[in-house]
Amino acid sequence: SVLLLQNQEVILLSFKIFRKNCCGLDVHKTWIYACIGITDTNGRTTYKQTRFSSFSKGLKELSTWLAKYQCTEVCMESTGKYWIPVFNVLEKEDVSVILSHPKYTKPQKGNKTDRKDAKWICDLFMCDMVKPSFIPPADIRHLRDLVRYRFKLICMITGEKNRAQNCLTVSNLKLDDVFSDVFGKSSRSITEYILKHPGDLFDVTPFVDRRCKTPIEEIQAAVDGAISPEQAVKLRQCLNHIDELEKHLEEIEQEILRL
């Protein structure tokens, strides 16, 4: 029930209770505020409120506390990533956890506290006024995390390749004009030689794959540049980082295939 003041008259609004025993959680980085609402056969609701640490010990205590009151339905906001450890622990205990976007559980204006927020979430959940967010099964979540990380690695590799290409450009080493892939076998071999022997004149023929369609004369002209010491250091670090990231990418892709 909610009390509203309109034209100096008190109006009582009643909401149907769909869940007789449920819990609302206000999850933060360090603490988790919990409120269980238990409604008896007469429609009277009593609340049990407490606070738990967000450490693993606190999550186990939360699970035990819910079991004590035979509460198997929980609702919490999807705030940042803090909800994920809570969800993982409760999911293993066969607790039905509803995740909701904060805009659907926005608390009332006024004297706002974490305990009141937990009770507000509990009340909304109790009256079935919370729009749940979709949470895929555990195996799909695991796969999704790896796929997202794979995408991040690809973006990082692309960024490093762009920085490496910039080093070649400012050094007037126009490998991108004569090779379709600046980081391919032939181009990479030439780049490695330039880094080991800066300023040396050399014949590119031994480094170029025989299947390369670009004339040797053009490739020879493309490497007629000069790389400064600072650009050489930067290029070396970029290439090393690319190799390291590609190794990580391969490991992640193998794990994705395993799943």
Regions found by a protein language model. Give the residues of each.
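A detector of single, family-specific signature residues
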Residues: 1-259
